[in-house]
Amino acid sequence: MAESRTSADGGMETSYGFREVADGEKQGLVNEVFHKVAKRYDIMNDVMSMGLHRAWKDAMISALNPRKDPSYKVLDVAGGTGDIAFRIVEASNRLAHATVLDINGSMLGVGAERAAKKKLTDNLTFVEANAEELPFEPNSFDAYTIAFGIRNVPRIDVALKEAYRVLKRGGRLLVLEFSEVDLPLLDRVYEAWSFNAIPQFGKAITGDAEPYQYLVESIRKFPNQQDFATMIREAGFSRVNFTNYTGGIAALHSGWKL
């Protein structure tokens, strides 16, 4: 579970991959990972998901079914490169507005460049901020999305409570994340791929295997589907459920602020 715990000396610790680090240290370590991979982030997702992340993201947008309405506002957290936000805007016939929030300026820079090339800048706002301290008023958004980002947040419970706070009544939370594989044979194959192939592919692509090693380890430390659903309920959300993709390699969690 990626939650804060009390260390032997009384300080607060959390997981950074398979390591335990001080609560205040994790964010800096995660930031460094994403500074290194920002320009190759989509390639990274292809490597980590064997290309399946594209289908999973399409399914996420279908589940969201964004309104074709200029008043419809979505907050996409940890969405720096814009992949989810672009899909949301396009699915709304370029009518909805998406705020892309990320704590990493390098990721946001990539997203802003891509948005300009796609001529989507009128539908997007890019904000550099922390998921645990959202710079928005309560009841500001119709939907909150986060894809492959929640496991990198030091205090997931705090981020979920912030999501609840900024959503309007009737607003929806959607979290797409790598999860616990529920088919034993697939689990063995995916584990071998994750711990052997992914870091080596990462080194070949970026010249550095370490960021990919962390990302693989962070998947294993993330709560399983049922435990994460419980965390979402504890943050205040109703009608919480999840859908497994590809045998549980990824899962889409949904909750509503009612």
From Swiss-Prot:
Keywords carried by this UniProt record: Menaquinone biosynthesis, Methyltransferase, S-adenosyl-L-methionine, Transferase, Ubiquinone biosynthesis
Positions contributing to S-adenosyl-L-methionine binding: 81, 102, 130-131
Reactions listed under catalytic activity: a 2-demethylmenaquinol + S-adenosyl-L-methionine = a menaquinol + S-adenosyl-L-homocysteine + H(+); a 2-methoxy-6-(all-trans-polyprenyl)benzene-1,4-diol + S-adenosyl-L-methionine = a 5-methoxy-2-methyl-3-(all-trans-polyprenyl)benzene-1,4-diol + S-adenosyl-L-homocysteine + H(+)
Keyword Methyltransferase set for record: yes
Top-level taxon: Bacteria
Any one GO MF annotation of this record: demethylmenaquinone methyltransferase activity
SUPFAM superfamilies, sorted: S-adenosyl-L-methionine-dependent methyltransferases (SSF53335)
UniProt similarity note: Belongs to the class I-like SAM-binding methyltransferase superfamily. MenG/UbiE family.
Protein name according to UniProt: Ubiquinone/menaquinone biosynthesis C-methyltransferase UbiE
